[in-house]
Amino acid sequence: MKTTTMSQLRQWKQEKRKFATLTAYDASFAQLFAEQGIQVLLVGDSLGMTLQGFDSTLPVTVADVAYHTRAVRRGAPHCLLLADMPFMSYATPELAFTHAAELMRAGANMVKLEGGSWLCDTIRMLAERAVPVCGHLGLTPQSVNIFGGYKVQGREEVAANQLLQDAIVLEQAGAQLLVLECVPVELAQRVTEELTIPVIGIGAGNVTDGQILVMHDALGITGGHTPKFSKNFLAHSAGDIRAAIKLYIEEVEGGIYPAEEHTFQ
């Protein structure tokens, strides 16, 4: 099996070929996802909520993400593997480099940072030191206390224009990938068309280059409230996890998921 690379993702964008990605936290699920055809995985700081039982991602540490990154890498050696930089782990460019190096040594191919234009110096420094970076705009969970909860971002014209400008400058600074979370579909389309780098959406409609879901949402095992954009693929697959993942991939690649009911206007 060939290893998935960023050049492939860029080619898929040019070919308008949509791709499906998932979070993963252990070797067993990583292997299962890869065997069904998932080629991009994220060790998300969402592990704080899905695995550790916290009500936000803020308590997650670099050591936590590194531990799970090592496990996922062993389970899916050929996937393009992203790892989240946790809250306050990239407060300065120097701190970001130290922690990014730890995650890269753990097996990540790329690190993901949440934030706008204020991150440009950090992204530039990492890119110059051979650390690939994925940006993250829209609803950035590490900023939940500023946002006042998990709310759709970019609905007002000023906020939408600022998000688009942030996306442009992050790409100019050296970001190779962008996650866009919980934004209106029209804004997601503007960002996806404006950037030359691939854009992965979550709660951003079916107009982005790729889609990502937290694995617990995709399999319907999230306790309590589930996001509007999530879909329980396991419930549509007679309880067969492998069939659920294949269905997820098929619906993303076919532009079926996310549907209008999963989309913010």
UniProtKB/Swiss-Prot annotation:
Species of the source: Yersinia pseudotuberculosis serotype O:1b (strain IP 31758)
Under the heading NCBIfam families, the entry gives:
panB, PRK00311.1
Kindly tell me the pathway this chain contributes to. Answer: Cofactor biosynthesis; (R)-pantothenate biosynthesis; (R)-pantoate from 3-methyl-2-oxobutanoate: step 1/2
List of catalytic residues: E181 (proton acceptor)
The record lists the catalysed reaction(s) as: 3-methyl-2-oxobutanoate + (6R)-5,10-methylene-5,6,7,8-tetrahydrofolate + H2O = 2-dehydropantoate + (6S)-5,6,7,8-tetrahydrofolate
Q: What is its EC number?
A: 2.1.2.11
A GO BP entry? pantothenate biosynthetic process
By what name is this protein known? 3-methyl-2-oxobutanoate hydroxymethyltransferase
